[in-house]
Amino acid sequence: MGIRLLKMHGYDVDPNALKHFKQEDGKFSCYGGQMIESASPIYNLYRASQLRFPGEEILEEATKFAYNFLQEKIANNQIQEKWVISEHLIDEIKLGLKMPWYATLPRVEAAYYLQYYAGTGDVWIGKTFYRMPEISNDTYKELAVLDFNRCQAQHQFEWIYMQEWYQSSSVKAFGISKKELLLAYFLAAATIFEPERTQERIMWAKTQIVSRMIKSFLSKENTLSLEQKTTLLIDFGHDINGLNKINSVEKGNGLAGTLLTTFQQLLEEFDRYTTHQLKNAWSQWFVKLQQGEGDGGADAELLANTLNICAGHIAFNEDILSHRDYTTLSSLTTKICQRLTQIQDKKILEIKDGSIKDKELEEEMQALVKLVLEENGGGIDRNIKQTFLSVFKTFYYCAYHHAETTDAHIFKVLFEPVV
């Protein structure tokens, strides 16, 4: 886990250090020559090996070994452990195998971790031998529970507001259900959960819903003719204020006025400079929509740009948007999320040995993770890069999990208090 933690915080770590734990028969072991291999070290190996960059073959080998080892032990009811006595260890391992790192969201992971964290109810040999009170600590657990429930209360308050917005903006008239709104807000809250980031969460959810409202409006046969739709998209791409032309094109259509009002309110929640930046982001999206690329990748690009703008990462420094690192991240995120959207629509995500079978997609995801996590002097701010990773992971999450699993996560993160 030390390798994983260091990599996640930007340190240059050679994963070949794991070769010291690889035996001649290709298996990995905490100590060579053991009669019984414990589950917890192999589970930690599995968690660490998922965070890999292109070309790190030792981590790919470790992932396959650890995944198959743990699956076999669970199937045969042979989970054995000599380092810790924990009632929930097997539950934690089962969850980790079902929900790999790419398919986790921060608050989902936290909710389950708190569920399985037993505090002093767990017995660690290392804690007893070396007097490490910070391990399995009841005080830490109490603090974590209070923090989680405080954030959850804030999220519930915001969800009430989002439902009011849904009604006042007549979102249902565009064929968008309240459950879709809940999913959009959940993805935001499970990713950027801190209480002080309300504006970013709300903007995340609204951006996803408003973009769907626009696409729904343009796809309705009884709203505009094909020629009018084409003209409208061109106007949007060149001048976001061209949205007013909806009224002149189709004054008698009630949806047009509703859409116009909702879109303008979305942009007017910010100061003039931020609004200008948001208009530019939407203009790019409208151009993609005109070119028939308005799903998946373009949505991810719009969302990432919007979040970076709203968080103030680009304030008074629009040159960042044309920085080589930013454009590379944006292009790669767009390409990956476009593919993930296609996978989600067709339900064709195939998993083998804990990894997806689409090797090209997997390599692109590894490249994105490397660009985000590795420090490169003179590059863009780490928070900006992290935004692209956060957006990508929500797309992977939606492609990976079934609706029933997502519903369970929504309830656990937003509505079930931790005790």
Swiss-Prot record:
Pfam family, one: Terpene_synth
Keyword Aminoacyl-tRNA synthetase listed: no
BP terms from Gene Ontology: gibberellin biosynthetic process; miltiradiene biosynthetic process; terpenoid biosynthetic process
EC number: 5.5.1.12
Catalytic reactions of this protein: (2E,6E,10E)-geranylgeranyl diphosphate = (+)-copalyl diphosphate
Cystine connections: none
Subcellular location(s) per record: Plastid, Chloroplast
Tissues where this protein is expressed: Ubiquitous expression in roots, stems, leaves and flowers.
One GO CC term, this protein: chloroplast
Keyword presence, Transferase: no
GO molecular function: copalyl diphosphate synthase activity; magnesium ion binding; terpene synthase activity
Co-factor(s): Mg(2+)
Annotated positions binding substrate: 82
Protein keywords: Chloroplast, Isomerase, Magnesium, Metal-binding, Plastid
Main subcellular location of this protein, as a coarse class: plastid
Pathway(s) per entry: Secondary metabolite biosynthesis; terpenoid biosynthesis
Additional remark text: Abietane diterpenoids (e.g. miltiradiene, abietatriene and ferruginol) accumulate specifically in the periderm of roots. The ent-kaurene diterpenoid oridonin, main constituent of Isodon rubescens, accumulates in leaves.
Family: Belongs to the terpene synthase family. Tpsc subfamily.
Cited function: Involved in the biosynthesis of ent-kaurene diterpenoids natural products such as oridonin, miltiradiene, eriocalyxin B and nezukol, known to exhibit antitumor, anti-inflammatory and antibacterial activities. Catalyzes the conversion of (2E,6E,10E)-geranylgeranyl diphosphate (GGPP) to (+)-copalyl diphosphate ((+)-CPP).
The protein's name: Copalyl diphosphate synthase 2, chloroplastic
Source species of the chain: Isodon rubescens (Rabdosia rubescens)
